[in-house]
Amino acid sequence: MLNNASLKGHINVIGDGRCDSPGHNAKYLTYSMQNQDTKEVATVNVVQVTEAGNSNRMELVGFKRALADIGQTVSVKQVTTDRHSQVRKHMLENEKDKVYQNDVWHVVKSVLKKLRKATAKKECALLNKWTRSICNHLWWSSATCGGSYDVLKEKWISILQHVKNRHSWGGNKFVHKCSHSKLTNSKERKTKWIQASSPSYKALQDIVLNKRLLKDLKYLTNFDHTGSTEVYNALLNKYCPKSTHFSYEGMVSRCQLAALDHNAGALLPQATTKMGVARWNVAFPKHSKNWVVKPIKASKEKTYVHKMVDRVVESVKSDDTLLRITVPKLPPNIASTPKPEKSSIIASHRSRFHPY
């Protein structure tokens, strides 16, 4: 999977983990990393909960393994993930030679959640009309900061000026005015501006100037995304449905098949009609609650399937042994205590419905 990337000596990667069941009782976690340029899956690692101690630690274990796997083949220059605190701590303390970034979408999602919570209050209802613009402003700030944290921070905070109809100001080093063109009189009259003394403005200030958010902006300077890992995770549901138990070998095999399937379509162009017009699919995402269009890709040619079948047939004919999956030494049960004899459990069984 890394043959093309190895030609240039280093790659930027994006990573994400996926548990086999919702909540905090997962048995397996699958951690995948992709080449950021091609969106191809570079490595997939399966972690059983007994290897990490509990399900909350599995993502860090999977991340470390995936990064180590890729590091054996090529040099990793930059790593982009979600806002996982354990992964971030590991990168800042143990991988200082690599650039670390977060997916902008995850930060925007956090801001949106806070905005919706604030607008639920009657006195902050006006803020609801600005929610989409504020989130778009964070996207824009990250995309246009030129890799500078200081520029990104000033651009983000400038939303506090714009919402109260103030479009130029002093005191900053880089950003002194809004980037939009001069508003027409009609546009200015129709816009529901927020007064600086209002509860809505105070609530917005608390969100925009949140210390953790401002600190996290330094990981958004390269405007990176991990959306393609979600595409792989969605495809993985076909091969490895959640809340369905598989053996360790089964998990690894299914994840590898999903990776091959994903990579077969990663570089496909957008499909077109017979007249050469690009094809689009209309969708209504729940999070945005807006109709959007998404490109339809050309059909996959799963040539790897025929190669796999040919290899299996060839190995059977030649009595050759296929490469088997290496299974780590794992306890037969993920329970924290050894399984007792069935007879002793029956003997100690009591029911609240039949206590005697």
Please name every model-derived segment.
Residues 63-64, 204-205, 211-212, 262, ...:
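Short leucine-rich amphipathic alpha-helices used at interfaces
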Residues 79, 100-103, 214-356:
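Amphipathic alpha-helical/coiled-coil segments positioned at domain termini
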Residues 191-195, 203, 207-222, 229:
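Acidic, contiguous segments within the catalytic cores of piggyBac-derived transposases
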